[in-house]
Structures are given as structure tokens and as C-alpha cells.
Amino acid sequence: MGEKRKSRQAEVNIGMVGHVDHGKTTLTKALTGVWTDTHSEELRRGITIKIGFADAEIRRCPNCGRYSTSPVCPYCGHETEFVRRVSFIDAPGHEALMTTMLAGASLMDGAILVIAANEPCPRPQTREHLMALQIIGQKNIIIAQNKIELVDKEKALENYRQIKEFIEGTVAENAPIIPISALHGANIDVLVKAIEDFIPTPKRDPNKPPKMLVLRSFDVNKPGTPPEKLVGGVLGGSIVQGKLKVGDEIEIRPGVPYEEHGRIKYEPITTEIVSLQAGGQFVEEAYPGGLVGVGTKLDPYLTKGDLMAGNVVGKPGKLPPVWDSLRLEVHLLERVVGTEQELKVEPIKRKEVLLLNVGTARTMGLVTGLGKDEIEVKLQIPVCAEPGDRVAISRQIGSRWRLIGYGIIKE
């Protein structure tokens, strides 16, 4: 049994979302033992910039019935039983990194909204992240009322009432609110049980053509590696349907940029999968859930520094279409989210430039046409997406991009 457990892949992605400094990364560490801020700049500034992934095994103690992520029950010392493996996506809570958070949100099967008990609720990014979950239609939400060790009972209850008021009428209206201390590991068992109860593993059809959204891409070769020892580029992301196998031929869309008559165009590319990594293990097959590393025969120059982020991977000829322009059915929010003062969302104007998040891709769109609740946008970078997919729409307000609504891709 032990060996089988080792190669288990995470079967759901759970987003850690919320305002900067409310304890998302600390909570991820309490659940997984992994500190997801590994970027040097992140450690220096103490905030998450890139999206971090960390896996945990949800386990139940057959003796006392409590849940944990540990092989030995922290409450009674009995050996625990494996329930399932989950992957936590630690998304940035800083306002300037909202578009990164939206890319991560497209991979989430559920979310834990972390709200600090020692600050008034909602803070700007708390509201913004909840809106992002609303926009992508994510209803599997748990609220972790964190830093409970810093407040007395009265303050905790007042904060609880503020949270209840804040979530009324939103996708999180019926979300459980669980008081915890991520720092001291208090009430983590209750949170883990809530994950079991409220964030189910989605039913997936393994026979659908594979589709993976690329979030990161790397050149893993150290400087000075001799040419014969160089390995191909690596794509990091999450499979949203189907499965990938070592040896598969894959297509990547929209692909790589090239110049033609002074204009940048994109060309899909095909390559072969030479290795697959999931949950820190090399595997022969990878499925939806968790971060998957796909080793390819691509020139690592194409994949260095996240250059391939936003692409979609699948079987040649089986991927969604690539769009240079989109027709969107638009749903605007009443007010701009993320700003300290409340601003009304003005209607979209012709020739306005918007920032669009489509899956893990982000692109600028120039508004070329307006209709009733519809817009047409010409894209700076093409995207690979299905009709019916949701697109998050942000507008530049001051020096920041602010979420103002979403669009649904029309044929």
C-alpha cells in the first residue's frame, strides 16, 4: 500500500485566496509543510508574487475520527488512513498581482478565502478575490478566519459578523467560517474536515481529449551545461481534462511568436512529452489535479522565464480554436473592486484598451465594436479558448488594472 500511496497524484486544486498578509502562505505551510514563497524577491518582501503549489494528503484517524494531513494523528497518536491528495494553489494577495491570481483561479476546483480576524472585513483584496471567484463561477468556498490568537472573543465575534455581512448575496453566502490559527496549527483538523465536506473531487471523464493550461515554463539547464547534456524545455500547469502520457505527441497553442511584415504572429508548435512530474514524483501518466511538469523536446530558449505561460497543451488537432479577436457577452460589476473608495463601473467605450484573462493567458484587447451587452475586441496576443469560456475583464484605473466584470466568448 505504501508504494502506491507515494505515486498518488493530487485530485483537486484548492486556491488559497485573500488579502495580502492575512496568512495564506502560513496556512499553506500548516497544511502541507511547504513554504510556497520560494522566489528570492518573495522571501525578501514577504508576499507571494508567482503562484505557488503545494500538495497535502488528507488523512483520517480511524481511532478518534479527526482529520489531519499527517501520517500520525496529532490528537491521539494513532496511525491515520489516506483519504485523498489535494493541491493548494497559493495565489498572490497583493493588488498589483491580481491578474496573476486570476490565472490561478482558472485552475481552482475550490477555494479557501483567508480573512484575518484582527482587521476589519472586507479589506480591498478580500473583496477583489471573492469577486474573482464569483466571476469564474466558483461556489466551493471555505472561509478561514485566521490569526484568531491575536484577538479576544468579543473581537473575534465582531469580525465573524462582519464576514457574514460581507458574504451575503455572493457565491460564498453559505460558506462555512472556521476560526483558525495557522501559526499555531489551531483548529486545522476542523478546516481539513471542511475541505472534505465542501470541496469535492469533480467528476472527470478520462477519455476526453487532454487539455492542460500552462501557468509557468522553464529552462531547467544550469548555465554552462555542455550541449550534449542539455534537456528540453519544461511546461508547468494543470491538466483540466483527459490525461497526458510520456511519449505523447502534443500541440501547444497559440504557440510561439514570429514576425511577418512587421507584425507579430503566433504559430502553434508540436513536440513530444519526454517526462512527466506530478506531486514531486516522475510518473508515466498525469491526470487533472495538482501542478504537472511536462518535459518536452522544445528548445529551452522558448520556455525560459515563463515565456510559454498562457498556452494550452493537448493532442494535435484536438485543441480549442485560437482567436485574434473575440466577441464577448459582457457582464459588468456595479462597482470597481480593489479600490479603497467605491467607484461605479462606467460602460465600456469604443477604442478602450482592456486587460483580459482567459484561462491562464492574459492579453490586451482593443474594443473595436459595441452592441447591447456585447463587445468586440482585437487581441494583442491571440488566445486558445472554447466558445462559452469566461474571460475576466479589467480596466486601467489610476496606475492599476482593476477588475470590472467578465465576458463569455461567443461564436
Curated annotation (Swiss-Prot):
Entry's EC annotation: 3.6.5.3
Entry binding sites for Mg(2+) 2: D21, G46
Pfam family, one: GTP_EFTU
Binding site for Zn(2+): C61, C64, C73, C76
Residue sites binding GTP per the record: D21, H22, G23, K24, T25, T26, N146, K147, I148, E149, S181, A182, L183
Binding-site list for Mg(2+) 1: T25, T48
UniProt keyword list: GTP-binding, Hydrolase, Initiation factor, Magnesium, Metal-binding, Nucleotide-binding, Protein biosynthesis, Zinc
Annotated spans, G2: 46-50
tr-type G domain: residues covered: 9-203
Disulphide linkage map: none
Residue segments, region G5: 181-183
Region (G3): 90-93
Region (G1): 18-25
Molecular function GO terms recorded: GTP binding; GTPase activity; metal ion binding; translation elongation factor activity; translation initiation factor activity; tRNA binding
GO biological process, one term: formation of translation preinitiation complex
Reactions that this protein is recorded to catalyse: GTP + H2O = GDP + phosphate + H(+)
First-tier enzyme category under EC: hydrolase
Residue segments, region G4: 146-149
Complex and partners: Heterotrimer composed of an alpha, a beta and a gamma chain.
Protein role: eIF-2 functions in the early steps of protein synthesis by forming a ternary complex with GTP and initiator tRNA.
Protein name: Translation initiation factor 2 subunit gamma
Organism per entry: Pyrococcus abyssi (strain GE5 / Orsay)
